[in-house]
Amino acid sequence: MSESEIFGKVKDIVAEQLSVDADKVTPEASFQNDLDADSLDVVEMVMALEEEFDIEIPDEAAEEILTVQAAVDFIAGKVKA
């Protein structure tokens, strides 16, 4: 799966989970600062990403995933592994 395919799926999930317009979900968008996610939103989003990509995102890693691109990079590393 290419990084652009991963971004497309992440973008869809983030837009749905956070109830934001998909156009706002850019690689550099911060979940909390730009997309107004609270801590519960982030937990639910991480769970949705884990399910979609059939991966596990440890709590320590989830705390470091602050932007859409960080999520894409983490998932790309797991999917290719």
UniProtKB/Swiss-Prot annotation:
Pfam families: PP-binding (PF00550)
Domain Carrier positions: 4-79
PTMs per UniProt: 4'-phosphopantetheine is transferred from CoA to a specific serine of apo-ACP by AcpS. This modification is essential for activity because fatty acids are bound in thioester linkage to the sulfhydryl of the prosthetic group.
Cellular component per GO, a single term: cytosol
One annotated GO biological process: lipid A biosynthetic process
Pathway recorded for this protein: Lipid metabolism; fatty acid biosynthesis
Localization, UniProt: Cytoplasm
Keyword DNA damage found: no
The organism's place on the tree of life at top rank: Bacteria
SUPFAM superfamilies: ACP-like
Entry keyword annotation includes Cell wall biogenesis/degradation: no
Principal location: cytoplasm
InterPro entries for this protein: ACP (IPR003231), ACP-like_sf (IPR036736), PP-bd_ACP (IPR009081)
Sorted UniProt keywords: Cytoplasm, Fatty acid biosynthesis, Fatty acid metabolism, Lipid biosynthesis, Lipid metabolism, Phosphopantetheine, Phosphoprotein
Record PANTHER family: ACYL CARRIER PROTEIN, CARRIER DOMAIN-CONTAINING PROTEIN
Family: Belongs to the acyl carrier protein (ACP) family.
Function, as annotated: Carrier of the growing fatty acid chain in fatty acid biosynthesis.
Protein known as: Acyl carrier protein
Gene: acpP
